[in-house]
Amino acid sequence: MFLKRNRQTAKQKPLTMKDNRKKKTIQLSAAALGGLFWCMSTPLHAQEYTNFVLVNLDDVGYGDFSCNGAYGYTTPHIDSLAAQGVRFTHFLACQPISGASRAGLLTGCYPNRIGFAGAPGPDSDYGIHPDEMTMGELLKQKGYSTAIFGKWHLGDTHQFLPLQNGFDEYYGLPYSNDMWPNHPQQGEVFHFPDLPTYDGNEVAGYNTDQSRFTTDYTERAVKFIRKNRKKPFFLYLAHSMPHVPLAVSDKFKGKSEQGLFGDVMMEIDWSIGEVVKTLREEGLLDRTLIVITSDNGPWANYGNHAGSAGGLREAKATTFDGGNRVPCIMYWEGHTRPGSICNKLASNIDLFPTFAEIAGAPLPVRKIDGVSILSLVEGRKNADPRTSFVYYYNKNDLEAVTDGEFKLVFPHKYVTYEAYNPGNDGQPGNLANVTLTRPELYDLRRDPGERYNVIAQYPEKVIELNKIAEKYRKELGDDLTRNKGKERRSPGKKHAPVH
């Protein structure tokens, strides 16, 4: 039961940045009015819509759910959704670092297309550009109530905060929970100010006890669902955990066999269980798509305070698959096939157009990179909507490209977690800098851990993947080959005038 998606015509004249912002505003205003009249004239039971619950975890690796092989703790609520829904095995975060990954998730774009890089902190001068349509704004076109509880990371000044970018409610952190005065390297490497917790546009406190966050976010999520039970809603639950520093409430302290990290994961699983229970109690489970994923792989040099990449190579902040490949589970009663596994290539930037298709919301005028993966969610035969993915990192380095079966890695510098032992109990271990001097090719079908270079055996694959890379170098550029790219847009800048 889908609302038909509005499609833009090929002859539509491109808008300027200023015009596009007006267009975005007009779309939202018109949609709000249309939704008002629709609600006034149509009985609630006759309205057909799908709610969206998007749970985006922080630094959860591919192997950190028990259905993916986690050890020393269990995640029964997550596992139950996997058993009833679809588990993706080749789901890639658009970049292996928090801020950029979240910017891509919420706009459907490779982060470098929208000028977004890295993990902005309290001293950063950039954030989400006002002309970029976020997932919140996308769904508000169709009358959705929207909320984010948790980590934002798309900029920390007023113009960048959620309430100015498509969300009705916000409670949480503007950036990572380690960007505070209690950082283990404070005064040596970092000089962080006090960490604000926001409630809407106002600071509710500084350096909040982080053991409260998972429970606080969950309670607000439950309240939001109950308040909006009779109308469409989008809940973005962006837990601050298990990013370091780890913190857990008393009710889960000491519960796992894997120490504090396991305790934190058990509490996150409880949180997801509370959300599912609320949806069931309100009779909404059959009209809600639930997505559980992570922003990037684990921060492996934190040792027993870090997650597991599940045997994949390297971890967060690298474009080997330990950094980009993340768990993803989707459940949508009546649409996902119980216990199904999807091995097809997909990315977090694909959620934006997927939600748009389900909600019948028009896509933004500005170009996006995501493709709808609704066909994969529903398990349609021979569905294969994403045929390639490019791995960008740093400001604009194109480090690798894949077609889902083979991955071509280009020469680049990266940090390795494999040269030193990891740290422990909240202290990070050392990292080593490595330079890859020649391209390498990996057969991900047989070697998902990227250990065996088969570039000599598959010269035709190298040619195919290089063609894909060249296409993106022309569009988005590549600092490694000194290509500027013709289709990159600018991020928002602090204190920049908004027209």
Describe these PLM feature segments.
Residues 18, 28-33, 42-440, 448-467, ...:
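Formylglycine-dependent sulfatase
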Residues 1-25:
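N-terminal secretory signal peptides that target proteins for export/translocation
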